[in-house]
């Protein structure tokens, strides 16, 4: 899918393309990094529960489990919270033949269980002391970057021992487009043997909330000297009446099937 605006996500880069150059009507468009915004347009128009399987495209992705193009399953369930959606994903895995045991842990639980860090009540100075003690670079401006760094070094290696682990209620600083309640965002990720497979939210609903989150992301991209482009004003206009209360998830198909086959 070609979009008029790129992703605002701080850590996901869009691929831009020039179209109609031979017609002397050249314009810049962007390959979608997920079908999220297109699907939320449909949700705002009353589509109800909705799913899509499609190819998505991301720049600056390379490695054993990363690719510039991959297949994504994305779906939204009206009136679901993240716990209902996580349960449905477990049912989906069972339908695909998985009988592996599943574990659910909150972000705070997983940090305390595997590292004895009180992640939700630790400020940026506390976390910088921990990263320094581990010999890691602590030169970060935002606390969420240090939270993610510690997660990668202290938590992800432990998750390799768990066939399927769902981690929910992330710190509010990592909310992305998830609803925030108190110190946590109603967001979850699913890991299979330590590899992230799915990312889901209890979705924010109003156009104003999306505008605020997008602007926050664009400001961070600018601070990191990344292309920060502009807001998708067409999307915000389409969401004038908001979307219904729902939860949604994106699942990487290639990663999922490669791990189901183990």
Language model features: what each stretch is:
Residues 1-5, 9-45, 49-81, 119-262:
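A translation/RNA-centric and nucleic-acid-associated enzymatic feature enriched
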Residues 101-119:
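Short, conserved secondary-structure transition motifs
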Residues 81-107, 126:
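Acidic, low-complexity central loop/insert segments
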């Amino acid at each position: 899918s070609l979009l008029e605006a790129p992703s605002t996500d701080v850590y996901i880069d869009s691929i831009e393309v020039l179209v109609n150059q031979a017609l002397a009507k050249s314009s810049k468009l962007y390959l979608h990094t997920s079908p999220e915004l297109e699907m939320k347009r449909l949700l705002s128009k009353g589509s109800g529960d909705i799913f899509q399987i499609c190819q998505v495209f991301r720049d600056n992705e390379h490695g054993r489990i990363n690719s510039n193009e991959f297949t994504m399953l994305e779906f939204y369930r009206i009136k679901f919270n993240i716990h209902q959606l996580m349960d449905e994903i477990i049912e989906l895995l069972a339908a695909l033949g998985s009988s592996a045991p599943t574990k659910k842990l909150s972000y705070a639980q997983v940090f305390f269980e595997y590292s004895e860090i009180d992640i939700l009540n630790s400020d940026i100075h506390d976390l910088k002391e921990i990263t320094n003690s581990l010999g890691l670079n602590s030169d970060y401006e935002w606390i969420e970057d240090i939270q993610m760094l510690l997660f990668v070094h202290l938590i992800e290696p432990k998750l390799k021992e768990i066939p399927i682990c769902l981690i929910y209620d992330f710190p509010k600083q990592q909310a992305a487009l998830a609803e925030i309640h108190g110190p946590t965002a109603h967001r979850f990720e699913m890991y299979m043997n330590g590899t992230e497979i799915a990312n889901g939210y209890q979705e924010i609903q109003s156009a104003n909330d999306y505008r605020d989150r997008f602007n926050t992301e664009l400001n961070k991209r600018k601070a990191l000297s990344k292309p920060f482009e502009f807001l998708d004003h067409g999307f915000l206009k389409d969401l004038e009446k908001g979307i219904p209360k729902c939860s949604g998830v994106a699942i990487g198909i290639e990663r999922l099937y490669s791990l189901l086959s183990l």
